[in-house]
Swiss-Prot record:
NDH-1 shuttles electrons from NADH, via FMN and iron-sulfur (Fe-S) centers, to quinones in the respiratory chain. The immediate electron acceptor for the enzyme in this species is believed to be ubiquinone. Couples the redox reaction to proton translocation (for every two electrons transferred, four hydrogen ions are translocated across the cytoplasmic membrane), and thus conserves the redox energy in a proton gradient. It comes from the Bacteria. InterPro entries: NADH_UbQ_OxRdtase_chain4L/K, NUOK/Mnh_C1-like. GO terms for cellular component: NADH dehydrogenase complex; plasma membrane. NCBIfam families: PRK05715.1-1, PRK05715.1-2. Coiled coil: none annotated. The keyword RNA-binding does not apply. Belongs to the complex I subunit 4L family. It catalyses: a quinone + NADH + 5 H(+)(in) = a quinol + NAD(+) + 4 H(+)(out). It is a multi-pass membrane protein. GO terms for molecular function: NADH:ubiquinone reductase (non-electrogenic) activity; quinone binding. Its main location: membrane. This is NADH-quinone oxidoreductase subunit K.
Amino acid sequence: MIPLQHGLILAAILFVLGLTGLIIRRNLLFMLISLEVMINAAALAFVVAGSYWGQADGQVMYILAITLAAAEASIGLALLLQLYRRRHTLNIDTVSEMRG
């Protein structure tokens, strides 16, 4: 069995990598992928904690997190497609400019 600390450290590393990608990247698609990594890191922490204490609550929360991630990804990708069709770019700096 994997120790609790190792699983939580891995989840924290994944979360920090996702947060770093979210802050550094200027492409909306990569920002969406980084957000997915962060959601999966939180789900991993739930599974590790549930496994450590021998409870099924971690797996239930994992299923809930995956459902949330799937809904977020589908809505996010639909919005990205519409944005790309209108602006022909996914760069956050050019999208945030206002017309005037």
